[in-house]
Amino acid sequence: MTAWRNLASWLRQQELEAVLVTGRTNVRYFSGFAGSAGVLAVSGDVRKIFVDFRYVEQAEQTAPEFEVVRCQGNPLDAAADFLQQQAWRSIGFEEEILTVAEFSRLQAKVTADRWRPVRLEPLRTVKTAAEIENIVAAAVIADTALTNLLPMIRPGATEIELAAALEYEMRKLGSEKPAFETILASGPRSALPHGSASGKKLDAGDFVVIDFGATFSGYRSDMTRTVCVGTASAR
């Protein structure tokens, strides 16, 4: 795991002594932990992940380079308690992730003059070879799943049945979950932007728009295809 090392180097460049990582995507990226409740505190020589009792084992397994701190309550509050005890004068926080209420709770324990708003997404922009492999794997899963779905696209099938079948095919091929809500709309509904699958049955000659993606090791694919039910009319 080199991501946290890049983060520690970035802290020095930004003249920050530490950073509080709260966004789920960033928590996973920098630590490997993919649970729904976890917060990181990182400095040059500190790497802590705060989780509640449900996620201790998962954090120990997936974030081995972080010290796992079991919290009795909210991980954010536990992290704030820890930061309150440190002498750090400049601490980064994800201003686009935290709510006003959450930041108010942080300021109640760590004075406002010690906080610095940051965005961590630029650190993820340039992908490593391993990340690219994961993205390719997600795309291959989605492409193969669509190939498996094509024989099912016929008159009488409903949009929602086909969307479910496509997601099932992706799961069988190793997708963690859909990359986003699967869009599958046919006939006149295919003109809808981001049209959710409905109970509409496909008719012969319908065009079917499918916008979907797979997730592999946290990395997602996104592809859109249009197919015709049977033979398209001259129009």
What is each residue range found by the language model?
Residues M1-R235:
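Active-site neighborhoods and metal-handling regions in enzymes and metal-associated proteins
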